[in-house]
Curated annotation (Swiss-Prot):
Gene3D superfamilies: 2.40.30.20, ATP synthase alpha/beta chain, C-terminal domain (1.20.150.20), P-loop containing nucleotide triphosphate hydrolases (3.40.50.300). It is found in: Plastid, Chloroplast thylakoid membrane. ATP binds at G170, D171, R172, Q173, T174, G175, K176, T177. This is ATP synthase subunit alpha, chloroplastic. Produces ATP from ADP in the presence of a proton gradient across the membrane. The alpha chain is a regulatory subunit. The lineage of its organism: Eukaryota, Viridiplantae, Streptophyta, Embryophyta, Tracheophyta. Belongs to the ATPase alpha/beta chains family. It comes from Jasminum nudiflorum. Its EC number is 7.1.2.2. It is a peripheral membrane protein. InterPro entries: ATP_synth_asu-like_sf, ATP_synth_asu_C, ATP_synth_asu_C_sf, ATP_synth_F1_a_nt-bd_dom, ATP_synth_F1_asu, ATPase_a/bsu_AS, ATPase_F1/V1/A1_a/bsu_N, ATPase_F1/V1/A1_a/bsu_N_sf. Its main location: plastid. It catalyses: ATP + H2O + 4 H(+)(in) = ADP + phosphate + 5 H(+)(out). The keyword Nucleotide-binding applies. The record marks S363 as: Required for activity.
């Protein structure tokens, strides 16, 4: 018979008792009452925070948005097809955040900052909250440095500064994305990090933008955040905030950033869908009451930091799509009131072959000439006024049979000025080339040419100036002013090229 050794048993028990760690883990849990259409109703989750992440039994993550007396309304970050009624849900105690690092440059991500370009995982040691507060008044300074878009019409008449928020607004298929991608391409060598956020777009459109950026060598300083049209509404709603968090990471590291939201109409629609399914009361155009706050808290994150924070900047170019030119709809008026100006793209101008189809008359930059180099201010001062007068005259001239000489010459000048603002896609111009273009038009050098020859002449003049008068570009780049020496060089180049052009 085996003898029982009491001392051994007591020692073992004593060791076990000493090792016992009375750690109680309290988990805030709930039960799924109902699920469908990307929304789940949860019973329980008594101490959940608004905006807290919750995890379902089968792994789907959701955000608690509606905290009601009897249940919690959760929006899902996935399709939720495997979630069953009665399954358990636990609160994570975390708010949505994403990893951030330099390694994200050149990559295509989704709204959760996970790569979707098939090039492997991205290593990151830091993380940022998707929704973080905008910089306060003290930490900002006024916009004073230009952000060149490479488009003559914008840089000369609707200048954008670093830290500004400039809305690009227009109907579908008017070239809004083209203006944005051209601006990204023009940041090459300017030490600006770009973030392009595609919200609810076709996958083919996003692929086209990525290809354009790769061909232009712009992907090395660009991050693309994309949530396609078939993505859950929650992710389409989150994508712009993810883009803003990535841009902020670089801004607070004393760098300049440019972020494009393409487009905020789709984000508002995704948010409307979520709100209606959560049974929040609808307001104007069935949007929820806080749709203004949806966009204002996003766009207020764009800023120009003061010197104590390192003078970094985040420039935002939100895009909004209008329905048949109706700028007075709910979302367009909201975003116009939040931003520092708008670039209005017109379908009529686009169809008339004027591209970029910018309606200069109703486009405006509220930062104004503070965001222009001195050289551009010197040359482009009269351009907007002359074009506005021309548009008015042109409308009047349709009814007049015989016009006096002065009116005819003003109309002829206006047509040529409109012609010089035309620019092909993915062909941004340097500041020097823009100054040359505007000067040639406003000083009347193009008046003797046929309208069809204007762009040919300007192309030839750019080449001539680059090869024979390189000092011109050097003066503009180094001094940022249109000096007398630069003007003499430009006049010589124009006359030489004009003689050569007329002989052809």
């Amino acid at each position: 018979m085996v003898s029982i050794r009491a001392d051994e048993i007591s020692n073992t028990l004593r060791e076990r008792i000493e090792q016992y760690n009375r750690e109680v883990k309290i988990v805030n849990t709930g039960t799924v009452l109902q699920v469908g259409d990307g929304i789940a109703r949860i019973h329980g989750l008594d101490e959940v925070m608004a905006g807290e992440l919750v995890e379902f039994e089968e792994g789907t993550i959701g955000i608690a948005l509606n905290l009601e007396s009897t249940n919690v309304g959760v929006v899902l970050m996935g399709d939720g097809l495997m979630i069953e009624e009665g399954s358990s849900v636990k609160a994570t105690g975390r708010i949505a955040q994403i990893p951030v690092s330099e390694a994200y440059l050149g990559r295509v991500l989704n709204a959760l900052a996970k790569p979707i370009d098939g090039r492997g995982e991205i290593s990151a040691s830091e993380s940022r909250l998707i929704e973080s507060p905008a910089p306060g008044i003290i930490s900002r300074r006024s916009v004073y440095e230009p952000l060149q878009t490479g488009l003559v019409a914008i840089d000369s008449m609707i200048p954008i500064g670093r830290g500004q928020r400039e809305l690009i607004i227009g109907d579908r298929q008017t070239g809004k994305t083209a203006v944005a991608t051209d601006t990204i391409l023009n940041q090459q060598g300017q030490n600006v990090i770009c973030v392009y956020v595609a919200i609810g777009q076709k996958a083919s459109s996003v692929a086209q933008v990525v290809t354009t950026l790769q061909e232009g060598g712009a992907m090395e300083y660009t991050i693309v955040v994309a949530e396609m049209a078939d993505s859950p509404a929650t992710l389409q709603y989150l994508a712009p905030y993810t883009g803003a968090a990535l841009a902020e990471y670089f801004m607070y590291r004393k760098q300049h950033t440019l972020i494009i939201y393409d487009d905020l109409s789709k984000q508002a629609q995704a948010y409307r869908q979520m709100s209606l399914l959560l049974r929040r009361p609808p307001g104007r155009e069935a949007y929820p009451g806080d749709v203004f706050y949806l966009h204002s808290r996003l766009l207020e994150r764009a800023a120009k930091s003061n010197s104590s924070l390192g003078e970094g900047s985040m420039t935002a170019l939100p895009i909004v799509e209008t329905q048949s030119g109706d700028v007075s709809a709910y979302i367009p008026t909201n975003v116009i009131s939040i931003t520092d100006g708008q670039i209005f793209l017109s379908a009529d101008l686009f169809n008339a072959g004027i591209r970029p189809a910018i309606n200069v008359g109703i486009s405006v930059s509220r930062v104004g000439s503070a965001a222009q180099t001195k050289a551009m201010k010197q040359v482009a001062g009269k351009l907007k006024l002359e074009l506005a007068q021309f548009t008015e005259l042109e409308a009047f001239a349709q009814f007049a049979s015989d016009l006096d000489k002065a009116t005819q010459s003003q109309l002829a000048r206006g047509r040529r000025l409109r012609e010089l603002l035309k620019q092909s896609q993915s062909a941004p111009l340097t500041v020097g080339e823009q100054i040359m273009t505007v000067y040639t038009g406003t000083k009347g050098y193009l008046d003797s040419l046929e309208i069809g020859q204007v762009s040919k002449f300007l192309d030839a003049l750019r080449t001539h100036l680059k090869t024979n008068k390189p000092q011109f570009q050097e003066i503009i780049s180094s001094t940022k002013t249109f000096t007398e020496e630069a003007e003499v060089l430009l006049k010589e180049a124009i006359q030489e090229q004009m003689e050569r052009f007329l002989l052809q």
